């Protein structure tokens, strides 16, 4: 088990003084702050750790690129840790994942695609977006996964496809009355 409490003492100065030194600085930093967040009991502290994780994703993009891919990780993390804190976090996660998918297109990770549809449906259920938007989101997601299945079929992609199909079917967003 990693000793993050000790590790942060040497990590922080490197992060502050040499932010472009290594992508691993960000990978390790995110792991470390996720551990802190998941073991914290105070809500304000958990939220501060989540904010730090978001900042680390942004800095990783700034120094090492891979914007679409890293935005996918950022959107997943935001929704994992803040989804239950209010619809504004779902909206923010949805927008981050949408941008990730627009950049990555057929290289989008299946988890990003599935979570994007889940967020879209959540926003529809909360009357934040119309069913037409959910349908457009589903079409985009479905096309990405179909293209991935054509290029290199895998059970992971097939499960993602089945998951978005089930979620969209269960959501009632496809009704003619909506």
Residue ranges and their predicted role:
Residues 1-178:
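Preference for long, solvent-exposed alpha-helical segments and helix-linker "stalks"
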């Amino acid at each position: 088990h990693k000793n993050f409490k000790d590790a942060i003492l040497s990590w922080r100065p490197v992060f502050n003084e040499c932010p472009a030194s290594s992508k691993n600085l960000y990978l390790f930093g995110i792991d470390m702050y996720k551990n802190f967040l998941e073991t914290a009991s105070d809500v304000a502290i958990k939220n501060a750790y989540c904010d730090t994780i978001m900042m680390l994703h942004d800095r990783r993009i700034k120094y090492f690129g891979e914007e679409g891919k890293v935005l996918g990780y950022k959107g997943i993390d935001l929704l994992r840790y803040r989804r239950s804190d209010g619809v504004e976090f779902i909206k923010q996660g949805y927008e981050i994942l949408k941008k990730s998918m627009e950049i990555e297109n057929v290289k989008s990770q299946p988890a990003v695609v599935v979570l994007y549809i889940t967020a879209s449906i959540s926003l529809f259920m909360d009357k934040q977006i119309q069913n037409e938007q959910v349908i457009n989101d589903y079409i985009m997601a479905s096309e990405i996964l179909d293209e991935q299945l054509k290029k290199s079929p895998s059970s992971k992609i097939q499960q993602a496809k089945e998951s978005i199909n089930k979620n969209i079917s269960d959501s009632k967003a496809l009704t003619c009355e909506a």
